[in-house]
Amino acid sequence: MDQDIKTVIQYPVGATEFDIPFDYLSRKFVRVSLVADDNRRLLSNITEYRYVSKTRVKLLVETTGFDRVEIRRFTSASERIVDFSDGSVLRAADLNVSQIQSAHIAEEARDAALMAMPEDDAGNLDARNRKIVRLAPGEAGTDAINKNQLDETLGEAGGILSDFEDVRDEIIQYISKFTDDTGAVRGVSYVYNNGRALGGETGFHIDITPPPLGVPYLSINGSKQYRGYHFTYDPITGNVQGLATPLEKDDFVVATTTESVTPIEDLYASTQGASMIGTLSGSTVEERIAEVEQSVLDSIDGIRVDSFIGMTDSGAIDAAIAEALRVNSYVKFSPRVYTVDRPVILPSKTVLVGTQGLTKIVASASWNGPVVMSKDAPAGDYLTINVPSAMVYGVYIFGIIIESGWKGTTDDSRYHTECLRIYGAGTILKGVRVGKCRGDGANLGGRGLTAIDYGAPSLYSDVRADLIGKNGITIGGSSDNHTQNIVVRNAGLLEHDVYYCIGIGPGGGTRGNEYHTWHSGDAQITPLYQNRPKYGLYLAGWDTYITNGHFEGAASAQIANFGGRNQVTNVRAYSTWDQDKCTVLVAGPAFKFVGNIGAPMNNVPANRCHAFQLGTADIQVNQVEITAQVNGQKFVNYVNAGGSNSIAVRGTLGIAGASGIGTLVTGTVPDDNELTIIAEPYKGKRLGLNLILTGDKGLTCRDVNSTGQISGVNALLTGKVMLTGLSSDIPTTPGTVYVDSNGNLKVKL
């Protein structure tokens, strides 16, 4: 008999398009479902799948949680494709369609019967590895039973076995106490083979050194056996021989020995000695030694989260942290994803160790708070918060990815807080990555505690933030933090020109090396990647020194200094994304910059961007030192800079292009401030001129165009001017400054 299923087919998930292997009269008779062993989801045409062709469909939804795609034909028996009326003309095509619909209904009924619980070749019902549900309790001896009946029966049997185990344990405890009674002058009990005979023995060895002088009797399962009647004993070898009845498996055998003196010293020196000495805690020395050994092993191997069986990931992590702190060890994570439904709380001296790039802690869909946080860590911006009572110290995290699970949609408010929130001192982060977070990526703060172990400074290295809704990485506090390889990509996605990639402050100083911020489109955040952070590097505090870095993609400034005595050196920064902004904003005193200002982004008009802005309308800056090579941007905008001999701007200006790219200065240069800008050669020819100006009050604009011409307002230079490196070739453009063959300074008329 043909047993093939014709109208139902299942495919494994993994593809997006699937063939329809059977014919059908209407698309409404075809059902597409996602299937798992304990779940099924019927999909809707157009919104959740669509037809690629008459014989092929394409899924439009994720298949997470399912392992099969089922395509089934279910022809309606009530919705007739052809409806005959009296007096109508019968056509062969209509008859064929009607006949096919009837055949389809019959074929589907046959398949349904085969798939329900068919008989196998031997006539047995075949459940085909599926559960049989709602099964009534069995009554007759040949009836099937359900799980409740089985559990009840096993529970009764387990209770009986438990009673036997309790009695056995009581016997062993009684014998152990009797053995430990070192006050007995004569009579030391020996339990053979830990209370369980192997079975078949007619004798055994009493493992006591030296061998007992005598064994007056044995107790076998409570029945006394006397020497000379039921067995013999050799005091030289310590062997019991000639048992009248061989022992049976699990017989409980106790030998009562006789010695000339109570051997306390010998007992304490034996392998059982430590188990006979008690401690004040109620345990024995042997038990305490075992605890110490376990502590030593734990300190070497760490407390493994996966060793806590039967718990959720959150419960297992909490238990591992508590145990690690108890034995002064660390928490070891496996290379897998841990899903948490509450924050992972880190008390002082907590150490988490994962496998770099493979261990991941992810918030479940039910949790919208911080994923990992220090104990009692306050909420808020750690650039400003100072709550000493909430601090922890000595928290270490190595090689762990922390994610909130955000997909980058503005209406998904579940993931609104930080991936990582640590408020403390002496924190060490190494190889930590945070991401997919609608709030802040990593919020790190606290004040220095140099007077205690694990105090200042905190150390952050190889720390990265990706796909962040608000601020990327905040390094707060005043604990002289040391940082290395800090990377932020795609921060500030929730709102344009509001947040920062890396923020440092408010005081105490941070030492940093190899910083990198940038912004790029990503398929996971397509609705939001147009939003860009306000600042790449935001310096809100004092005495911060950053060297070696790359900054691009911010809206208002790649580097913004609002603190004091800060230095950023050996870095490269690119033009801002928004127009009329600046690459480096100096809004705090005593700032030093050394680096390269790169060409603007493709869609940023260069003539509307400054490499540097000194001061704001509300903030006057002084003691600023800038040494830079500027390419393709206006050099510096003096907005609000003052202080005698306090502003020094030196550098080279790159090749001119569109109008305004070669602008040297806009705004007002204060008296007695140094301004040195040198035009760079291009293809062996000097395009501009060396310009050294001092005391040139009221200078508003200087342009250097592609031919070396000086143009713009205030064309005549006042004050002290030195022109060097001028071309000796006679120019063709009027107004160009050059040197003739006799060394005379001339201007082409």
Swiss-Prot record:
Keyword match Cytoplasm: no
GO terms for cellular component: virus tail
Keyword Coiled coil set for record: no
Record's keyword terms, sorted: Degradation of host capsule during virus entry, Degradation of host cell envelope components during virus entry, Host-virus interaction, Viral attachment to host adhesion receptor, Viral attachment to host cell, Viral tail protein, Virion, Virus entry into host cell
Entry's Gene Ontology BP terms: adhesion receptor-mediated virion attachment to host cell; symbiont entry into host cell via disruption of host cell envelope; symbiont entry into host cell via disruption of host cell glycocalyx
InterPro entries in UniProt: Pectin_lyase_fold/virulence, Phage_T7_tail_fibre-like_N
Pfam families xrefs: Phage_T7_tail (PF03906)
Protein location: Virion
Cross-referenced SUPFAM superfamilies: Pectin lyase-like (SSF51126)
Assembly mode: Interacts (via N-terminus) with depolymerase 2 (via N-terminus); this interaction probably gives rise to a branched tailspike.
Family recorded in the similarity comment: In the N-terminal section; belongs to the Teseptimavirus fiber family.
Function: Functions as a receptor binding protein (RBP) and probably mediates the attachment to the host capsular exopolysaccharides. Displays a depolymerase activity that specifically degrades the K8-type polysaccharides of Klebsiella pneumoniae capsule, which allows the phage to reach the host cell membrane and bind the entry receptor.
Domains: entry comment: The N-terminus anchors the RBP to the virion. The central part and C-terminus probably binds and degrades the host exopolysaccharides.
Designated name of the protein: Depolymerase 1, capsule K8-specific
Native source organism of the sequence: Klebsiella phage K5-4 (Bacteriophage K5-4)
